[in-house]
Amino acid sequence: MMSPPLRYQKDQQNQQHQQNQSQQAAHQMVSFMPQTPTSLPSTPIQLYPTGAAALIPAPPTYELIPNRIFVGGFPTSTTETELREHFEKFFAVKDVKMVKSLDGQSKGYGFITFETEDQAEEIRKLTPKQLEFRSRKLNLGPAIRKINSNSFQPSYAIATPSQLVAASPGPFSYAIPASPSPYSGYSYPASPQMFVYPPLRSQDQSRQQSEQQTTPQNSPTNLQHQQSPQVFFGGDQDPIRSYASAVAGVEKSEVSPEKHESVSPQPLLPNQNVLNTQYSQGQQQWNSNVQQQQQQQMDSNNGGPYYNENYSQGYTRPHPYQQFAQSGVYMNSQGMYHSSYSYMTPPLAPGQYPQMMSAPYWQQQQQHHQSHAYAGYNPAYNNWVGPSGDMNQFKQNPSNYFYQNYPGNFSQQHTMGNNENTFSLPLQAPRQGKKSRKPSECQDKKTKSPIKGARTERPSSSASTPDAKYQKNHRYPVHLSPLSASLQSLAISSPTKNN
C-alpha cells in the first residue's frame, strides 16, 4: 500500500502527462491554420490581382471604318434628306444612316459616308461653327468597327484616365481618341476614375449562373463565360452605354437602356391541384349558404308586412328605429294574446313560445283590431292610446283606461269620444305677445272702410235700443224673445221725431 506522499507524486505525473498530450494535439491543429500577424500591416492587402486582369477581359480590337464619320447633336426631328442636303454643301454624300429607337424616333445622331477617305477627313477637320445646322453645333467623331467579338455575347465598356473604349451590340462602334481632339461639342472629365460594377443579367444568364453555383469554385474557363462588367464614371449613376450617346448630347433620361427581366424561381406547392379543388369546393359551399340565407330572408319579408320577420326562428330582429325585440306572447286579463317586447333581449330557442309575430300595439289598429275604435292612434284628437297617451284618463276613470290597446269594460256610449274621461282635448295656450282687445275695438275694426281715411256710418237707431247696447257691450249675442224682437223691428221702421 502506497503512502500518501507517493500517491500524490503519481497523481501529479499523470496530470502533467495529460496536459502535454493536449498541448501537442492543439499544436498540430494550429499548424494547419494560417498564422495570425502580430501587428496590422502598414500597406493595404490586395484582394484581387493588380489591374483586375482576372475580372476585366482585354478589350477587343477595333478598326476605323473608311469614308465614314459620326455626326451627333442635331434635332431629333431631322430627316435623312435634310442631313444629306446639309453635308452635300461640302462633298458628295454616298450614304446617310440615322440611329433610331424602337418606336422609330431619331436619337439625334447618325453616320455619313462619303466617296473617299480624304473627304471624310476634311469634314472631321472643320470647326463646329462651320458645320452649324439649325443653329446647333454638330459633334463629329470617327466611326469604328469591332474586329473580334471573343466569347462574350453582350457588349461592355472600359474607361481609363487616358481613353474610353465603348462597344455596342450594333454593327457600328465609336471611340474617343486619347490625343487632344479639336472638337469642342462634348466635354468629359479631365481625369475620370474607373469603377467596375457587375452588369445587369438577363433571364438566360441568371439561369446559367444558378447552374454554375453548384461547382465548388469558379475556374478561369467559367470566368470567361461570365458577363463582362460595365464601367461608370465618378458621379454618374447610369452606365456609359456608347460613345454615340455621349457625343450626341442626348440626356440620360432620353437614352433607353436595355431592359433585362429577372425572374425569381417560384416554389411549387405540393398537391396544388388538390388545394385548388378544395378551395373551389369551399367557395361554392359558402356561396350556396349565402344564397340560401338571402332566399329565406326574402321569403319571410314577403310573407309579412313588418321589418325582417322570420317565422321559423322564434324571434325577430329589432327595427332600426325600435330598440326592443319580441321575446314571446302573454295573455291579458281579457283572455287575449299579446306580443311581449323587451329591450334588446337575446333570441329564444325555437318552440319556447307560440310563434305569433305582430306589430307593436300602436300599429295594430288598422290590421288586426279594426273593430276597436280606440285601439292605437286616434286621428280625431291627435292622441295616442296606451302608455304614451294621456295618463289622466287612468286617474279619472281606471275602468275605461286602455291597457295594451284593449279597452276594459268600455261602454258603447263613449264610442264617439264625447266623454271627458275617454279622450281629453289638448289645451291651447294663447300666443305670446297677442294683444287682448275690447269688444268695442273689435267692432270698430270690423266697420272700417277698405279705403284709407274713410269711415262708414252706423245707423243711430240700432245703438239707441237697449238690446243693441247690450249686444255691443257683451262678446256673445243675446237671444231675444218674440216680443222684444217685434218691438225692436217696430222701433227701427218708425223712428221718433223730436219737435
Curated annotation (Swiss-Prot):
Residues 66-144 form the RRM domain. Residues 12-28, 195-224, 280-304, 480-499 have a biased composition (Low complexity). Germline specific. More strongly expressed during oogenesis than during spermatogenesis. During the larval stages, it is more abundant at the distal region than the proximal region of the gonad. In young adult hermaphrodites, it is expressed at a very low level in the distal mitotic region of the gonad, and begins to accumulate in the meiotic transition zone. Highly expressed in the proximal pachytene region. Not expressed in mature oocytes. Not expressed in the spermatheca. Weakly or not expressed in the germline of adult males. One of its GO terms (biological process) is 3'-UTR-mediated mRNA stabilization. The keyword RNA-binding applies. One of its GO terms (molecular function) is translation activator activity. Residues 263-279, 406-425 have a biased composition (Polar residues). CDD domains: RRM_DAZL_BOULE. InterPro entries: DAZ_BOULE_RRM, DAZ_dom, Nucleotide-bd_a/b_plait_sf, RBD_domain_sf, RRM_dom. RNA-binding protein that plays a central role in oogenesis, but not for spermatogenesis. Required for meiotic entry and germline differentiation, at the pachytene stage of meiosis I of female germline regardless of the sex of the soma. May act by regulating translation of specific mRNAs, possibly by binding to their 3'-UTR. Belongs to the RRM DAZ family. This is DAZ protein 1.
